[in-house]
Swiss-Prot record:
Its EC number is 6.1.1.1. SMART domains: S4 (SM00363). It comes from Yersinia pestis. The gene is tyrS. The lineage of its organism: Bacteria, Pseudomonadati, Pseudomonadota, Gammaproteobacteria, Enterobacterales. L-tyrosine binds at residues 37, 175, 179. It catalyses: tRNA(Tyr) + L-tyrosine + ATP = L-tyrosyl-tRNA(Tyr) + AMP + diphosphate + H(+). A motif ('KMSKS' region) lies at residues 235-239. This is Tyrosine--tRNA ligase.
Length: 424
């Protein structure tokens, strides 16, 4: 992306929900590089897919020559943003928040270049300016610039105030002031002139613009990226098991890869615009190719490879593809011990068995069949595979060769029903 028409390029990809004074911002970007920031509050020990679009937006600006600031909210994370939340957030301990700050800082770092000259990225933590601030300073220097009338009319707060079952605490009500001061502080210390964030952050961003103008007489700007939705109306970034996390210990590279592989045809080309750095020409050409091929579309695999490689690196992508190919072909010889551990982590049905269990008992314990009699029938009808190889002997007893890495055996009934045995 080039700097001169960056806003237009983002709009063409569907990446702009709202922008303050679009013409003035476009003119400012055309004049030369600016500094911009996006904040990430440590409300969990990992970022999830919902954070990926604004994070990649920071990267898009850096690739166009601008300087990104990744702000981790060590202070705001102890308060909790009430924006469009139905109820009060649970307050986490300072130790927990500090631990999560470090984890999120490490997650953000690979997406940005912190050593590329004048537009090298900056990592910041708002606890650095809020940690030592006393309440009188907060009220006198920040609070006096805010009208409560305007604050309660912001849509994000109004929704909470209108709920009969829950109001809003002063703690969460004050969050807006904290985020606003972040913008003013980063403007003073790093010349930050633009804040980006999710569309739910619009009220906080405009407050920061107003406060920066009052405190520093600077014109600054805000831009929000859209809330990602799926064509069928269901939530994006959720599976039956919950959120899709960027931390491989919470969502393995294989499960992450499979999430993208399962993208609906109605969504995949739009998601390529949101989550990859492919040009629009490349995406349009891929869509045309898929339409004319008469085969299953290639786009899901392109999307899965791009995003998994970006988040989990070459090794994570290789493992995800290796597991996928092995389960599809039934040939498990290329799988590593860590690959089997990923399957267990991802929620593949797993059962622990003593080493004297036979195949019939294993099928029953694995809940692949209801009884030993049914197990005999399934085995005899060639419907059971051990580590990808069919086994037709109803009296079969496992051998050491079946215990891959001395501990794992993958049972399959039919084509889709799996269970991973972990041998005791």
């Amino acid at each position: 992306m080039t700097s001169s028409n960056l806003i237009k390029q983002l709009q063409e990809r569907g990446l702009v929900a709202q922008v303050t004074d679009e013409d003035a911002l476009a003119e400012r970007l055309a004049q030369g590089p600016i500094s911009l920031y996006c904040g990430f509050d440590p409300t969990a020990d990992s970022l999830h897919l919902g954070h990926l679009v604004p994070l990649l937006c920071l990267k898009r600006f850096q690739l166009a020559g601008h300087r990104p600031v990744a702000l981790v909210g060590g202070a705001t994370g102890m308060i909790g943003d009430p924006s469009f939340k139905a109820s009060e957030r649970k307050l986490n301990t300072e130790d927990t928040v500090n631990e999560w700050v470090e984890k999120i800082r490490h997650q953000v770092s690979p997406f940005l270049d912190f050593d590329c000259g004048e537009n090298s990225a900056i990592a910041a933590n708002n606890y650095d300016w809020f940690g030592g601030m006393n309440v009188l300073t907060f009220l006198r220097d920040i609070g006096k610039h805010f009208s409560v009338n305007q604050m309660i009319n912001k849509e994000a707060v109004k929704q909470r105030l209108n709920r009969d079952d829950s109001g809003i605490s002063f703690t969460e009500f004050s969050y807006n002031l904290l985020q606003a001061y972040d913008f003013a502080c980063l403007n003073k210390n790093h010349g930050v002139a633009l804040q980006i964030g999710g569309s739910d952050q619009w009220g906080n961003i405009t407050s920061g613009i107003d406060l920066t103008r009052r405190l520093h007489q600077q014109q600054v700007y805000g831009l929000t990226v859209p809330l990602i939705t799926k064509a069928d109306g269901t939530k994006f970034g959720k599976t039956e098991g919950g959120a899709v996390w960027l931390d491989p210990k919470k969502t393995s590279p294989y499960k992450f890869y499979q999430f993208w592989i399962n993208t609906a045809d109605a969504d995949v080309y739009r998601f390529l615009k949101f989550f990859t750095f492919m040009s629009l020409e490349e995406i349009n050409a891929l869509e045309e190719e898929d339409k004319n091929s008469g085969k299953a579309p290639r786009a899901q695999y392109v999307l899965a490879e791009n995003v998994t490689g970006m988040v989990h690196g070459p090794e994570g992508l290789a493992a995800a593809k290796r597991i996928t190919d092995s389960l599809f072909s039934g040939d498990l010889h290329d799988m590593t011990e860590a690959d089997f551990a990923q399957l267990a982590q991802d929620g593949m049905p797993t059962v622990e068995l003593n080493r004297d269990a036979d195949l019939q008992q294993a099928l029953v314990n694995a809940e692949l069949v209801p009884s030993r009699g049914q197990a005999r029938t399934m085995i005899g009808s060639n419907a059971v595979a051990i580590n990808g190889e069919k086994q037709a002997d109803p009296e079969y007893v496992f051998t050491d060769a079946d215990r891959l890495f001395g501990r794992y055996t993958l049972l399959r009934r039919g084509k889709k029903h799996y269970c991973l045995i972990s041998w005791l």
